Amino acid sequence: MENIPTVGLGTWKASPGEVTDAVKLAINLGYRHFDCAYLYHNESEVGMGISEKIKEGVVKREDLFVVSKLWCTCHKKSLVKTACTNTLEALNLDYLDLYLIHWPMGFKPGEKDIPLDRNGKVIPSHTSFLDTWEAMEDLVFEGLVKNLGVSNFNHEQLERLLDKPGLRVRPITNQIECHPYLNQKKLIDFCHKRNVSVTAYRPLGGSGGGFHLMDDTVIRKIAKKHGKSPAQILIRFQIQRNLIVIPKSVTPSRIRENIQVFDFELTEKDMEELLSLDKNLRLATFPTTENHQDYPFHIEY
């Protein structure tokens, strides 16, 4: 299992016009882990940033850890390889360091990323992520992908995959939403016990759901005490829980700040206070898919 660099640059909701510069700056600042996905519709611009830095000799391809994700409309076994090669083409790369199943749910294949019925609910593809996984394993043996992982899997789904008869490639990470308002303790404990790392997306929360983690008085107090920003506290919190963290930003000052998290340590009391903020408050609920048999959030964790 390869070591995934602890802090990566998230590229979700990074507009194509901004993301190339963000990637170039991030590489200059020492980022080596880039989290991408077909669904973000900006992979070719991410790839341009990576290619320019490789061409300039700032980094070699093997110094980078590039992640992408298989979208839900491509869960049919016959569609997996094309989805992967399309991503590689967009990123202008020969291989991915890590390829994730973006969600455990398969959707009807076709033009639309999220095909909905007349009631506004997703149209499933009647595939099983266990079958999808077999096609992803083939990608490893064909040299297109070095490692596999999952995203948004609950513990039962991850267990089904880990216990699958004839499993050839183990998932190395479960990428999940994680921040102090949704600290995911039970799921993280489960993953770590089963030797699967956890990657935290939306570690800074976000403006959805009507809350701003950055304004939380406890987080601000701890930030002030350490002479750091609230974002740096939120990232450091996850690092000290042995998580991989992928904060998204296209703002130069924030891209810089988000990786300057290795020169201080939160105390045990800080960590306890941050853990006590849990409200089980999830931002990425994907409500149009609640009808799907593999919807991951109907159970506690």
UniProtKB/Swiss-Prot annotation:
EC number: 1.1.1.263
Keyword Cytoplasm belongs to the record: yes
Cellular compartments annotated: Cytoplasm
Residues holding substrate: H102
UniProt: NADP(+) binding residues: 35, 175, 246-258
Pfam families with a match to the protein in the record: Aldo_ket_red
A molecular function (GO) term: 1,5-anhydro-D-fructose reductase activity
Catalytic activity field: 1,5-anhydro-D-glucitol + NADP(+) = 1,5-anhydro-D-fructose + NADPH + H(+)
Entry's Gene Ontology cellular component terms: cytoplasm
Main localisation: cytoplasm
EC class: oxidoreductase
Keyword Cytoplasm included in the entry's annotation: yes
Keywords associated with the record: Cytoplasm, NADP, Oxidoreductase
InterPro entries: AKR, Aldo/ket_reductase_CS, NADP_OxRdtase_dom, NADP_OxRdtase_dom_sf
Sites annotated Lowers pKa of active site Tyr: K69
Positions annotated as active site in the UniProt record: Y40
Activity regulation annotation text: Inhibited by p-chloromercuribenzoic acid and alkyliodines.
Role summary: Catalyzes the NADPH-dependent reduction of 1,5-anhydro-D-fructose (AF) to 1,5-anhydro-D-glucitol.
Binding partners and assembly: Monomer.
Family, as annotated: Belongs to the aldo/keto reductase family.
Protein name: 1,5-anhydro-D-fructose reductase
Gene that encodes the chain: Akr1e2
